[in-house]
Amino acid sequence: MATQIPSKPSTSETVPTESLKERINRQMIVILDFGSQYSELIARRIRETNVYSEVLSYRTSAEQLRQLAPKGIILSGGPNSVYDKNAPQCTQEIWDLGIPILGVCYGMQLMVQQLGGKVERAKRAEYGKASLHIDDPTDLLTNVEDNSIAWMSHGDSCIELPDGFKILAHTDNTPCAAIANHEQKLFGVQFHPEVVHSVGGIALIRNFVYHICECEPTWTTEAFVEEAIREIRAKIGDKRVLLALSGGVDSSTLAFLLHRAIGDQLTCMFIDQGFMRKGEPERLMEIFDHQFHIPVVYVNSREQFLEQLKGVTDPEEKRRLIGHEFIKVFEEESNRLGPFDYLAQGTLYPDVIESADSNVDPQTGERVAVKIKSHHNVGGLPKNLRFKLVEPLRKLFKDEVRKVARSIGLPEEIVRRHPFPGPGLAIRIIGEVTSERLKILRDADFVVRDEISKQGMYHDFWQAFAVLLPVRSVGVMGDQRTYAHPVVLRLITSEDGMTADWAKVPYDLLEIISNRIVNEVRGVNRVVYDITSKPPGTIEWE
């Protein structure tokens, strides 16, 4: 029996007079970002406690903070020293807002410096794990065990505290590992409670959120879905919406959410550019069109995408051409199917943060963005498209999208699908993309996914895939000399894709995968395993 998704309500349904959004925002924690690699992680950790959080620039004014009226503020870490000439500084007025504040690493040092204390270069820098000795186990450090592990990453130290502050904890090398001014509800920690290595970190964050800021747990999956549907209906009214479906968890969740909110006013378009994994286009159509009765317009553009990549070997040029062709096909099909009033996009919160505020340059204090490679997801739709945007997922992190997906009934194969780049297999073929090389890689990649699934290990990896190299190697098969392609196996573990470790896969599984690829995939005679972590490498090869 097909699973039914509730469509738009009858006009007799009542709309709540008070928005959930207002209730959620009244419990918000704001993170002021000073360029830390962990700022987003702090926000995620707070949201895991069912309290909403946002990451804002350290330049946010006191007046803006007053208008937001958060229950608490966290000052993030950062790469600078507070005594540097161009070190980023928050407004001094922040200390007079009467809002509880927690400074983390650089944030704590900034608190100390701005309130009259002293920060200097530490005699001994502290990086990695340290034992946290607790001097005052109340308030911030309630339920944090004495001598538990804390993750340190600092070269400076607070050597003199402002008036009204006391030491809550220390390490062997850091006299002021945690501090507090209880009267003003100002707290600081020299370590990073948000990272998994800090054993008592989650307890500390919960203490700040619930005991010090007195937040209520209003940020839940159910609350988000309810509010998102209400906002979609209010914004769209009786207009039509177009969504470019990719088959990933983001666009699939967006499709389900929109269909639940506005029903047949939504048109989903799937552009098959020919670079998806084996069986994926067919399975996508089966799930949406047949299983859940969400109509999808299928556009077969395989030949024209392949034609665009003829003779192209540069990875950035591949991305550019694929993106350009995607826009061309999208415009043609939207004109044919239209008119539409809205374009739905699966923008996530990290995209919002990245576009609003990039990293802090440690030399100048200015925020800059360094491009490692063009973003994998094929987007970049032209600015002159005649659509208004609707982005219901723009407040969510990836892990939150998966929770929403599960709550609204998406199949687990989509919910827990490994991340897949927008250009697909085209950037896992090093060098020119041809139909022959696509078949080789598609077949090899299928073996990888098939075997880890058989072993019940699919969900043990963040990603698991094959890469086809543009070289050949000599081999021997059936007493005959072969000269064929090597395939690289890339299996990695990660929490969020920002950093990643190569997976310590059992040798017998690697052997099975290797034997199957060499025997089943024509054109391959060698299999190698990539043991590079991120950093220094990236997850994808291109």
From Swiss-Prot:
Residues 28-218 form the Glutamine amidotransferase type-1 domain. Pathway: Purine metabolism; GMP biosynthesis; GMP from XMP (L-Gln route): step 1/1. Catalyzes the synthesis of GMP from XMP. Homodimer. Residues 219-417 form the GMPS ATP-PPase domain. CDD domains: GATase1_GMP_Synthase, GMP_synthase_C. This is GMP synthase [glutamine-hydrolyzing]. It comes from Gloeothece citriformis (strain PCC 7424). ATP binds at S246, G247, G248, V249, D250, S251, S252. Gene3D superfamilies: 3.30.300.10, 3.40.50.880, HUPs. The lineage of its organism: Bacteria, Bacillati, Cyanobacteriota, Cyanophyceae, Oscillatoriophycideae.
